Amino acid sequence: MAKRKAIDEETRELFKSFAERFGLVRQDFFELHGVYIITRRGIEKIARGCNVSVTLEPVPEFTNVSEDKYCIKATARTLEGEKVETFGESSGKNTRIAYPISIAEKRAKARAVLQISKLYSLPVHSEDEADEFQEES
């Protein structure tokens, strides 16, 4: 796997302006391998800052309880009518936590919020998107 580069100064400035816009403080994000990782609390602040509502629904055709596979569809909408749909999934292959449905839901919501806020234009992910994105103590 190719090693990620450090975050460049232009990207740092863009992220800083996003962080200020959404009221993010240092506890709401961290850097890991050249990527900004937004915490659950940070995702909630971004959603409020964008006036986004998110609805979640299970996707039966991509869910198999007997195989411990779950898929949740998130639909994010702004007051201006912009809409984004995306998915969050969880299985034994990508989740080591004992509550896979919750993880699928968190991943779906986080992805929808990051997409509708345009933060995915930067090297940004939510901490819920992968176990390896959890902040190292």
Each language-model region and where it sits:
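Polyanion-binding surfaces on beta-sheet-dominated domains and ring/shell assemblies
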Residues: M1-S137
